[in-house]
Amino acid sequence: MALILDGKSLSKKIREEIKKEVENFTSKGFRPPALAVILVGNDPASEIYVNNKRKACEKVGIKSLFYHLPQDVSEEKLLGLIYELNMNEEVDGILVQLPLPKHIDQTRVILSISPEKDVDGFHPENMGKLVAQIEDGFIPCTPLGIDILLKHYGIDVKGKDVTIVGAGFIVGRPLSLLMLWRNATVSVCHIHTKDVKKFTKEADILISATGVPHLIKEDMIKEGAVVVDVGISRLNGKIVGDVDFERVKEKASAITPVPGGVGPMTVTALLLNTLKSYKRKFAHLISTTNP
């Protein structure tokens, strides 16, 4: 039976530490960290994700500023709001919930967010820092959450064969860069990969981020592999991941559940990035208040 990589319990522990750190700053007269969250439209899944992020902020003492714009909002109006938030010294992070409606240029929106407030880590400046392995950038939240989860359970990716199924902008691509930074040997499978099973069978660590329910079967992994499931879907009324959990857990050495694995770690990584931005802004003042 595989070790369950419990992202929910680890997230709870990290969030308690974040809360204490925020309380330490506010007790010295500093304002709390602030995250601005922008939601365009009424996509049910996006609304759930945004609510989860806002609740997580409030529980650790991070101020959540919520901007809910209509589905038909103009791109210029959205960019105008982002400009105002960029200029607001009391905002530490800006998050625009993706995906956006088709009439809005997602790339233009991402580029409009100040890199210093891009706590999602999608701005080319932060992606470039990930490529260059520069510590002071923001790492995208799901890859960062996975990295923290693996480290917590003592799973070292150095020298290991890591296969990532899914080459998306939000998870697959930045995760491949982060795994390279951690000195793994990385393979990335995508829609044009001819034989996905060939790569997954060789993986010491298999990470799937496709959103295709139960894509990863028991016969696609090798004995003793570590399996990380990023996907979240509904199948027959139940929430499931990319991995056929019940069967794969009998063959894997460690596995993340869905829900309760990567999801909570993604939100926790967002909180960590927001705190990082806040501390950077007040670094010179914080150091002078410490004995």
UniProtKB/Swiss-Prot annotation:
InterPro entries: Aminoacid_DH-like_N_sf (IPR046346), NAD(P)-bd_dom_sf (IPR036291), THF_DH/CycHdrlase (IPR000672), THF_DH/CycHdrlase_cat_dom (IPR020630), THF_DH/CycHdrlase_CS (IPR020867), THF_DH/CycHdrlase_NAD-bd_dom (IPR020631). Pathway: One-carbon metabolism; tetrahydrofolate interconversion. It catalyses: (6R)-5,10-methylene-5,6,7,8-tetrahydrofolate + NADP(+) = (6R)-5,10-methenyltetrahydrofolate + NADPH; (6R)-5,10-methenyltetrahydrofolate + H2O = (6R)-10-formyltetrahydrofolate + H(+). One of its GO terms (molecular function) is methylenetetrahydrofolate dehydrogenase (NADP+) activity. It comes from the Bacteria. PROSITE patterns: THF_DHG_CYH_1, THF_DHG_CYH_2. Coiled coil: none annotated. Keywords: Amino-acid biosynthesis, Histidine biosynthesis, Hydrolase, Methionine biosynthesis, Multifunctional enzyme, NADP, One-carbon metabolism, Oxidoreductase, Purine biosynthesis. Its EC number is 1.5.1.5, 3.5.4.9. One of its GO terms (biological process) is methionine biosynthetic process. Disulfide bonds: none annotated. Belongs to the tetrahydrofolate dehydrogenase/cyclohydrolase family. Homodimer. NCBIfam families: PRK10792.1, PRK14186.1. Catalyzes the oxidation of 5,10-methylenetetrahydrofolate to 5,10-methenyltetrahydrofolate and then the hydrolysis of 5,10-methenyltetrahydrofolate to 10-formyltetrahydrofolate. This is Bifunctional protein FolD.
